[in-house]
From Swiss-Prot:
ATP binds at residues 8-15. This is Nucleotide-binding protein Tola_2941. The keyword Ligase does not apply. It comes from Tolumonas auensis (strain DSM 9187 / NBRC 110442 / TA 4). GTP binds at residues 56-59. It holds the Pfam family PapZ_C. One of its GO terms (molecular function) is GTP binding.
Amino acid sequence: MKLIVVSGRSGSGKTVALRVLEDLGYYCVDNLPVSLLFQLVAELRGKYDQIAVSIDVRNLPATAEDLVSILDEIRQHQDLQFSSFFFDADNATLLKRYGESRRLHPLSRQQFTLAQAIRQETDLLSPLSSSADLRIDTSHISIHELSEQIRERVLGKKEHELVMVFESFGFKHGIAKDADFVFDARFLPNPHWIAELKPLTGLDEPVQRYLQSQPDVVKYINQLISLLETWLPQLERNNRSYVTVAIGCTGGQHRSVFIAEQLANHFLVLGKNVQRRHRTLEKLHAPG
């Protein structure tokens, strides 16, 4: 099991970090008391392989020694791949961020001014800062740059992996509303009008052979591939987690299924993270 503890001064980027880790498949828990870390790990063991926990200044043990002891014990746990990330920014940047957000600092309720609260937080979080495996100063980087740094550390590569979802649907059942791209295949030759192909789907070999023999179908698929390959790098750089490409035909049984499969197979061969979904076929085979 992998466990990442996210900490840092308030306003430095912990929330962004936790959101990125969630996108990367981590089960995330916000503001967990340090004393409950082992209980959480025991509860989630076998259910999740990757856990991320954020800790802020309100959830620390009573003493710095207790905090160090808990962290040391976690690091020595044989069944855990433990790492800790600490986020920080200079005092001027934190003051500016709080001024813009108009949020209260977690220590403000202790009658501290904002500047005093920021300094006090520095002292309280010192054990977490000094023992962190990764420290990121967010003073002069954007949210997107911070996200990329976290992904690079977690994945071992700079760009995060975009999930490409290819789905088919039938216009007569309603357009796919969750799609980023919608392409219409209703103008292409329709296997529905061929008696022996009508009861089949785009997943069946006779339908596939028929559509592969149609020049317009092949041309359309190649043009869609060219379009997606042209803009895919930009989508990846834009910090997208998913891009959904929907292909529609009249009923969602033949042409759209075939084209969605062809696109999915093409990008799968290129090493992309691909998912496929056939809305009409799922309805036809749904229980009840």
